[in-house]
Amino acid sequence: MKNLWIYMMVVVAMMTACKKDHSNYDYKTGEKITVKGIESSYTLISELDRLTLTPEVSSTEPNAQFEYLWGIYETNVQGSAPVLDTLAKTKDLNYLIKQAAKGWVLVYRVTNKTTGYSQYINVPVNVVTEFTRGWYVAKDDGTQSDLDLFLTPTSIVPTGKRENLYSSINGSKLPGQANLLSFLSAYKSTVTGTLGNTRTLVLSTDKDVATVNVNTLKKIFTLDNLLFDAPTVKGPCQVFPGGGSAYYLLNGGNVHSIVNISANIGKFGGRFLKDANNTPYSLSKYFISNTLSNAYFFDETSSTFFAIGNGYGTALSSISDVTGTAMSASNNNQKVLYMGLKSATYLPSPALRYVFTGCAVFQDKSNSSNKTLSSIDIDGYTMKLTNTSLTNADKLYNGANMTLMYGQENLMYFSMGGNQVWSRNLSNNFEKLEYTVPAGEEITFIRHKTGAETNYAYNYIMVGSKINGTYKIRMFNKASGSISGSPVATLEGTGTAKDILYISPSVSESTNTIQW
């Protein structure tokens, strides 16, 4: 019976295949609509520049009658589909740019009414303001913090400066001494009147934090209203992005998160618990995190590493030791003097995940003369530490202002003696004097910053220093990891500079790894 059914199915299939096709087809070449006179991209200043376009339109159909549509939509949208706003229904466009400073796509649709055929032209449009491109400097006067902006209209080297922008626009400085600057490209706010993604600069201090609309530099929230619940402690604060579009807030050793792929209004949730007993903890200001990773923290109370995966949950996740680790990730009796991220490596199939390498400098709580340099290999919620003991013979032993070169040479930079910049090769422990700031200056930070934007690319070692109530930030090129030549530029202003960050319309969380 089974064979009979198979035979009948084959016969039916053959009869169907032999059915004559009486449909009518037109095999002539399809219509082609050509549009000329539109550039491949545009960069325009909001409320100042007009987008004036007079395209040439033609068709291979001789009797074509066209109708037109100009529209624009935002590229950086999460949680909903992009919405096309109609600008005009004419062949030409003369439109005053009013959109917020961010990435947009201009759409030009030409339709032949005779045939119904349409041609679409999609063009990236970067909308900027004076505030949306340049080097931002977080600085303080010892008790209050502010922002300076060094303008870069045509290249990465600044040509102008705007001082004390935060206070001049918002009416007052931010309390406390400045900490890290960070940037969030998909932070939610209602600054435009409706809830949506807002490109946001975050200024943090040891007493407060402010989310700031890059479009206008007006503050959105400060610590008083940045949390759903009023904070019981105020500072030290810092905000940074993590994997899964999560944002993290450290405040007074506690951590809060926003899961940004879910509905939110730009406010951070409740304090993460350490365990079911709500055991007290106090997280270090140092962390390991970027948009590819979980966020990893070190509890200074218990000397224990913890993690948060993609911002989710209500409690910190514990870390397991990998066999062969030189030091446990839990209760290791250490104080962290520095910690940061060195590299992220994607494992091929069947793993299909990222693993991370970080670095830390520890000091033993029982014997403060014992210091250790640790390489930290992280895979999910497991960790292996490989230790190198430091002695007085190592310059790093007395180092300060440490920083790592994420994704590049296996080097750590640090300052010594207040005015010397040193590097340490983490592969062979070789230490090298890289630069000495002039007499009287004191180094306040060292950073490695990179950017790949066309015409604005940079790969700098940046050294901040202070003298007589003013700051200097020297920006150096590097060769094989070492400082190369004289500074490309030196930024100067009043106060003490604590951090620097480059912002442009193309910058996002993935282009900046925020760390000390």
Model segments located where?
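Acidic/polar, low-complexity intrinsically disordered N-terminal segments immediately downstream
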Residues: 19-164, 453-454, 465-516
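Preference for solvent-exposed, low-hydrophobicity sequence contexts
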Residues: 163-173, 179-181, 185-411, 428, ...
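Short glycine/acidic-enriched loop and turn motifs that connect beta-strands
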Residues: 141-145, 208-210, 254, 302, ...
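Structural hallmark of WD40 beta-propellers
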Residues: 409-412, 456-464
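C-terminal motif of bacterial Sec signal peptides marking the signal peptidase cleavage site
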Residues: 14-17
